[in-house]
């Protein structure tokens, strides 16, 4: 059973995410009132993790939350870097 607690911020050169995430169990369902999201397969996720942008984040719409994905309160501060756009290739 993998439990993830109190992830305050995750950032790299392409995507910056500031959020507060509570605890999630191995079934990827919220077990804390402060939980807003859970990860599918841990922080790395799939498709190379955060190096591939949104490919590394899973579980927002797949069984995260009670009653559907619309019940989750997701607070993401995304800085894509449009001012300084770079040609970065991954995967």
Curated annotation (Swiss-Prot):
Family: Belongs to the UPF0512 family.
Protein name from the UniProt record: UPF0512 protein A
